């Protein structure tokens, strides 16, 4: 980060008063910019005892198998995001979502939330990713 999103002036990395971590702080308006982890949501969609996997069509990890997942959007719940990602990536409609696993990857500042769910009617297709 180079510039303040509040006023446009430059920012510096420093520990603000009352804090114990480095943050980007504006040199003009003193706004503190918090950089937080990103939330990744996804599904483990099952139909008749089988789990739907996706083969990646884009980098990173093109041609690797993965579960349908992606970044959570503003204004949605984690189950809504997981269902949306399953539709976007595999054209699968899901229901009965139950939280299955939460894990974090601190090295890339991401938190993953996966839901077990039913793949409605077993149908799926190819998404753009």
Feature names for model-found ranges:
Residues 25, 52-53, 66, 98, ...:
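Conserved beta-strand segments that form the floor/walls of ligand-binding pockets within enzyme
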Residues 5, 27, 52, 73, ...:
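Nucleotide phosphate-binding site architecture
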Residues 22, 48-50, 109, 122:
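Beta-strand-connecting loop/turn residues
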């Amino acid at each position: 980060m180079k510039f303040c999103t509040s006023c446009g002036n430059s920012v510096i990395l420093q520990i603000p008063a009352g804090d114990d971590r480095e943050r980007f702080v504006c040199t003009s308006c003193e706004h503190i910019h918090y950089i937080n982890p990103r939330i990744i949501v996804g599904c483990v969609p099952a139909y008749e005892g089988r789990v739907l996997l996706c083969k990646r069509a884009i980098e990173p990890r093109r041609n690797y198998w993965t579960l349908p997942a992606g970044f959570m959007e503003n204004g949605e719940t984690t189950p809504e995001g997981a269902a949306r990602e399953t539709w976007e990536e595999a054209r699968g409609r899901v229901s009965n979502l139950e939280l299955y696993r939460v894990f974090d990857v601190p090295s890339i500042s991401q938190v993953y939330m996966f839901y077990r769910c039913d793949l409605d009617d077993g149908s799926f297709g190819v998404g753009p990713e």
